[in-house]
Amino acid sequence: MAPGEDAIHFELPQRWNDDYKPGTACSTPGDTGAYVTARDRWFKQTDAASVANHDSVDMPVTQTVTQTREQTFKVSAKVKGEGELAKIMTNTFGFTYVHEVHWKLNQKVGPYTLPAGQQGRLAWGFIILEAEGQNVRCTPDLVWKQSGKPYHISAPETKYAELQIDQAPHYNN
C-alpha cells in the first residue's frame, strides 16, 4: 500500500531542533549534514486476520505470526551514510530510527479484547515516517547551505498492531 491509499495516518512528529537547517549558523566550514522534514506518518499493514465474537462476553484475540516480515530504511537518492541519516532523524524527531524492523516467525500479536457481538480484523505491520531530506554543507562564512538535490526518505519507526472493530451481523434462520 502506498502512502495515501486507504492508509491509517498518524500525527507527524514534532521537530526537536533546527540543526542543519539551510540558512542557519554552523561552526565548522566543510562539515556536512542533512536537514530532514517529516511529511507523512502512516500504518503499512503487512498482515491481518478476521475475527468475530458471537458470544455474550468479551474475548481475548491473539494471532501468531506465520511469515517473517521486514521493513527497511529507504532513500530515493544515493546518500552517503544512510546510518548517519538515521541518527540525524533520531536526533531531529526523538524516535529511534534503525535500518530495519522485523516481525519474527511465531511472534504473538495481541492480546486485544474483542467485545461481545463484534467482529473485526486484527491487523499488523509497521509505522512508516515519510520525510524529505536535503544535504547541507557548512560554508566558509559559517552558514548551512543546500548541497545537491532534495530526496525522499521512507523510514520504519516501529512494529504496530491494532484491532479494527465492526458490528457483527446477525442472521435470522
Please report, for each region that a protein language model flagged, where it lies by residue.
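N-terminal hydrophobic or amphipathic segments with adjacent small-residue motifs
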Residues: N17-Y20, I88, I127
